[in-house]
From Swiss-Prot:
This is Acetyl-coenzyme A carboxylase carboxyl transferase subunit beta 2. Its cofactor is Zn(2+). Residues 25-289 form the CoA carboxyltransferase N-terminal domain. Zn(2+) binds at C29, C32, C48, C51. It comes from the Bacteria. It catalyses: N(6)-carboxybiotinyl-L-lysyl-[protein] + acetyl-CoA = N(6)-biotinyl-L-lysyl-[protein] + malonyl-CoA. Pathway: Lipid metabolism; malonyl-CoA biosynthesis; malonyl-CoA from acetyl-CoA: step 1/1. It is found in: Cytoplasm. Component of the acetyl coenzyme A carboxylase (ACC) complex. Biotin carboxylase (BC) catalyzes the carboxylation of biotin on its carrier protein (BCCP) and then the CO(2) group is transferred by the transcarboxylase to acetyl-CoA to form malonyl-CoA. A zinc finger (C4-type) spans 29-51. Gene3D superfamilies: 2-enoyl-CoA Hydratase, Chain A, domain 1. The gene is accD2.
Length: 289
C-alpha cells in the first residue's frame, strides 16, 4: 500500500466533527486558571492540585468528608424560612427563598449533623454559601441553637464551618437577633465544659464573623480564606486609606492574633480530632490506611 493509500485509508481518517462535552465535567481554578477534571477535584476536597487553592465546598460535601462514614445523621432539619415581613427589594423574599432552595436543595443556609470524628462523638454544622450567600436568618439561628442543645444533652463537642456574607437583610432585626441568640447558646456550651471549634472558610463576613465564627475555644482558618466584618472596599472608602496587601486573609489574621491556626483541608479531620480529644480527655481512633 502506497503512502497515499495509507493516508486515505478509512481507519486513519481523523473525525473532525465537533463533539459535545456534558456541562460540569471540567472546571477552572479561579486562582491559577488550571483546567481541572470535576470528579478528581471533588475527590481532592475541592483543592486545586496545582496551586493548592481552597475552593468553596457545599455544606453537605464538607460534613460528609469531615465526619466518619456511616456515623452521621442530620439534625434540626425541620425548620423552613418564612417571609413574615413581606419583604421586597428587586424580588420578593419568598421568591429568593424558593430560588435558593431549588438551586441548592437545602431548606436554608445551615446544615447540622451529629456523628463521630475519629471515633469521638461530635455535632458539626456547615454554612451553605450558595444559599443567599450563607446569610444568617432566624432559621439558621434556630438550627444552630438546636445543634448546641443536642451537643449539651449528648455530651458532644461542637464544630462549625462558617461561610457567610452576614445577617440576612430580608429578615431585618430578626436576623440581627440571631447574633445574640447563638452567642448565648455558645456561652451555655462553654459553661458545661464542652469544646467548640470554629473553622472560618472563604468567605466569612458580617454578623456571623462578629458572633459564632469568632467565639470558638479554638478558631481555625483555611488557607487564604477571606475573613472580616465589612468588606475591604467599604473600609477603604470609609477610612480613606489603602489597606495592607493580604488584609482580611486568614494568614494576616493569624499573624495579628485573630486566629489560632491555619489548617489545610486535607488535614482538618486529624487536626480537629486531636484537639477535641485533648479538650475532652478522650482517645481517637487512627485513620485507616
Amino acid at each position: 500500500m502506497s503512502w497515499l493509500e495509507k493516508l486515505l485509508d478509512k481507519n486513519n481518517i481523523i473525525n473532525t466533527r465537533k463533539t459535545s462535552i456534558p456541562e460540569g465535567v471540567w472546571t477552572k481554578c479561579p486562582s491559577c486558571e488550571q483546567v481541572l477534571y470535576r470528579i478528581a477535584l471533588k475527590e481532592n476536597l475541592e483543592v486545586c492540585p496545582k496551586c493548592n487553592h481552597h475552593m468553596r465546598m457545599t455544606a453537605r460535601d464538607r460534613l460528609d468528608s469531615f465526619l466518619d462514614k456511616e456515623k452521621q445523621s442530620e439534625i434540626a432539619c425541620e425548620y423552613e424560612p418564612k417571609d413574615v415581613l413581606n419583604f421586597k427589594d428587586k424580588k420578593r423574599y419568598k421568591e429568593r427563598i424558593a430560588l435558593a432552595q431549588k438551586s441548592t436543595g437545602e431548606k436554608d443556609a445551615l446544615v447540622a449533623m451529629k456523628g463521630e470524628l475519629l471515633g469521638l462523638p461530635i455535632v458539626a454544622c456547615a454554612f451553605e454559601f450558595s444559599f443567599m450567600a450563607g446569610s444568617m436568618g432566624s432559621v439558621v439561628g434556630a438550627k444552630f441553637v438546636e445543634a448546641v442543645d443536642i451537643a449539651i444533652e449528648e455530651n458532644r463537642g461542637l464544630v462549625c464551618f462558617s461561610a457567610c456574607g452576614g445577617a440576612r437583610m430580608q429578615e431585618s432585626l430578626m436576623a440581627l437577633m440571631q447574633m445574640a441568640k447563638t452567642s448565648a447558646a455558645l456561652d451555655h456550651l462553654s459553661r458545661v465544659g464542652l469544646p467548640y471549634i470554629s473553622v472560618l472558610t472563604d468567605q466569612t463576613f458580617g454578623g456571623v464573623s462578629a458572633s459564632i465564627a469568632m467565639m470558638g475555644d479554638i478558631n481555625i482558618g483555611e488557607p487564604e480564606a477571606r475573613i472580616g466584618f465589612a468588606g475591604r472596599r467599604v473600609i477603604e472608602q470609609t477610612v480613606r486609606e489603602k489597606l495592607p496587601d493580604g488584609f482580611q486573609q486568614s494568614e494576616f489574621l493569624l499573624e495579628h492574633g485573630a486566629l489560632d491556626m491555619i489548617v489545610e483541608r486535607s488535614d482538618m479531620r486529624r487536626k480537629i480530632g486531636g484537639l477535641i480529644a485533648k479538650l475532652t480527655n478522650k482517645s481517637i481512633q487512627p485513620e485507616a490506611e
